[in-house]
């Protein structure tokens, strides 16, 4: 028992000794560990403080300037709108197995990509079939354009006058010749010619003229629509009798003008179109809006119904597809718009196609314009009994009135009405007119560019008021913008009566009636 106790005591002593020794060793080992933990804790505390300071700096830092916000917002709007349905070649859509992919250089024609920023979205929907047919036409343009192999083959046949001579290209052409220097009529006529080319699967070639390339961007990717200057018949375009009686089966000449003879009007008859099917080159001289007459050709009717389920949208969609202002003209448009029209809540266009003739008639027309505008809530009423609007009815809504007229007097009178008198509800009204010149009389160089800019600005209006005497310029404007204008009624005995104006039934150009053709069918 004593041995056992002794052993036990020894063991206890050993254990105690070991414990003390282990404790010492453990303490020795723990010292550096505690030091490391303190260091890590300090680092963690520093990181936490740094994190808090960074968060505070993010919260309390100065907000970005308004300019940055506006720039970023404008960029987002632009990117968003560029993907909207603003025209066939700007968007990327898929129709069946057909991809419509942009293939233009943006910088060469900014208006093609920026138009939706200045004009409100069209209330009309373009048919998917029109998208499809335009894409097919662009394919035709790439295959049959000037100086392509197909073009050269067809040109060789024209020179030889032999239909059976050499390889067949499969390309047919319609050459549009302008017979009217007026810009508006040129655009109406050219849109009509393009629809004819679309319906007959012909390549449209456009006579260059003195200013066409200065006014309009190329509408089709990769290939020009302008007739090459070296085209062999260029020198004979004014010799109509020579073209009619050339005896060359490869070319036909047709003259479509408002004063066409009965024989020339037969162009819109089915039999005439059948005869032209085998003719590779058709020279078409036109001076007016003949698009409505194409709806009378029986073989075109079904195709037109598919292209334009709403018949009166034809010019609207075709003009937006074809007519893109060049960068020079686009600069005129955007600078004016941004300076005078952009900040307004509403933009009202007024086209006055009547020259100033006598004080009494002049004042009657001013009164009628104002009466029309106020009756239909386009223009605000003025309070001639007060110097300032009542603070009880203060309305800060702004309206910009854009006046297009060759006579400065109308602009000055309407401007003075809103300058000299407060509006009843306190609206802010600004009245603008870009120029006093008559563009119609000098359709070239800068005057044509300004005329095109003015047409475009009118098309950007939210509402449009026009005099009863129509102009091709305003017809293009409301057709391009998809607007049904308010048309002033003709005054009786120089005095206007109710109704002062009526809203047009269509957005299409309508002052030029469909050509009566007298076809047997």
Swiss-Prot record:
Is Glycoprotein found in the keyword set? yes
- Glycosylated residues are 152, 222, 493
Pfam family, any one:
XG_FTase
Residues assigned to the Cytoplasmic compartment are: 1-39
* Compartmental location: Golgi apparatus, Golgi stack membrane
Does Glycosyltransferase show up as a keyword for this record?
A: yes
Tissue pattern of expression reads:
Expressed in roots, stems, leaves, flowers, siliques and seedlings.
Comp. bias (Basic and acidic residues)? 1-12
Biological processes, Gene Ontology terms: cell wall biogenesis; cell wall organization; protein glycosylation
The record's EC number reads 2.4.1.-
The transmembrane residues are 40-60
Alphabetized, the UniProt keywords read: Cell wall biogenesis/degradation, Glycoprotein, Glycosyltransferase, Golgi apparatus, Membrane, Signal-anchor, Transferase, Transmembrane, Transmembrane helix
Q: Name one GO molecular function term.
A: galactoside 2-alpha-L-fucosyltransferase activity
**Which InterPro entries does UniProt cross-reference here?**
XG_FTase
Topology feature Lumenal, residues? 61-521
Any one GO CC term of the record: Golgi cisterna membrane
What's its job?
Answer: May be involved in cell wall biosynthesis. May act as a fucosyltransferase.
Protein name in UniProt: Fucosyltransferase 3
The primary gene name is FUT3
């Amino acid at each position: 028992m004593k041995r056992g106790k002794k052993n036990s005591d020894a063991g206890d002593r050993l254990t105690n000794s070991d414990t003390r020794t282990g404790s010492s060793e453990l303490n020795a080992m723990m010292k550096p560990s505690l030091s490391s933990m303190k260091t890590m804790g300090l680092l963690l505390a520093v990181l936490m403080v740094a994190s808090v300071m960074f968060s505070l700096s993010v919260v309390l830092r100065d907000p970005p300037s308004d300019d940055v916000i506006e720039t970023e917002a404008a960029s987002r709007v632009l990117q968003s709108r560029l993907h909207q349905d603003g025209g066939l070649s700007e968007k990327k859509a898929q129709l069946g197995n057909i991809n419509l992919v942009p293939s233009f250089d943006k910088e060469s024609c900014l208006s093609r990509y920026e138009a939706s920023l200045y004009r409100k979205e069209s209330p009309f929907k373009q048919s998917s079939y029109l998208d499809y047919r335009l894409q097919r036409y662009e394919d035709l343009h790439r295959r049959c354009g000037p100086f392509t192999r197909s073009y050269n083959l067809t040109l060789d046949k024209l020179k030889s006058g032999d239909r059976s001579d050499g390889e067949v290209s499969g390309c047919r052409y319609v050459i549009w010749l302008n017979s009217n220097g007026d810009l508006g009529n040129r655009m109406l006529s050219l849109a009509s010619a393009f629809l004819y080319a679309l319906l007959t699967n012909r390549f449209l070639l456009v006579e260059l003229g003195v200013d066409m390339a200065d006014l309009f961007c190329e509408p089709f990717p990769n290939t020009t629509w302008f007739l090459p200057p070296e085209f062999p018949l260029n020198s004979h375009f004014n010799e109509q009798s020579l073209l009619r009686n050339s005896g060359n089966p490869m070319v036909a000449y047709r003259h479509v003008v408002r004063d066409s003879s009965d024989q020339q009007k037969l162009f819109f008859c089915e039999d005439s179109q059948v005869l032209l099917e085998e003719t590779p080159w058709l020279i078409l001289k036109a001076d007016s809006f003949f698009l409505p007459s194409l709806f009378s050709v029986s073989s075109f009717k079904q195709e037109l119904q598919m292209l334009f389920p709403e018949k009166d949208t034809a010019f609207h969609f075709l003009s937006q597809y074809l007519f893109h202002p060049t960068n020079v003209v686009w600069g005129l448009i955007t600078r004016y718009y941004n300076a005078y029209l952009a900040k307004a809540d509403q933009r009202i266009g007024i086209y006055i196609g009547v020259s100033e003739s006598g004080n009494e008639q002049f004042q009657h027309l001013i009164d009628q314009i104002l009466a029309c505008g106020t009756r239909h809530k386009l223009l605000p009423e003025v309070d001639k009994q007060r110097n300032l609007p009542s603070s009880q009815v203060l309305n800060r809504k702004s309206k910009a009135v854009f006046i297009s007229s060759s006579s400065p007097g109308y602009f000055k009178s309407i401007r003075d009405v809103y300058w000299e008198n407060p509006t009843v509800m306190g609206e802010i009204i600004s009245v603008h007119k870009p120029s006093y010149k008559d563009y119609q009389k000098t359709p070239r160089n800068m005057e044509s560019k300004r005329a095109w800019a003015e047409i475009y600005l009118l098309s950007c209006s939210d509402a449009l008021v026009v005099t009863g005497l129509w102009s091709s310029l305003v017809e293009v404007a409301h057709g391009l913008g998809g607007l049904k204008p308010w048309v002033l009624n003709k005054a009786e005995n120089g005095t206007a009566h109710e109704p002062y104006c009526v809203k047009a039934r269509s957005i299409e150009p309508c002052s030029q009636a469909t050509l009566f053709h007298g076809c047997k069918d």
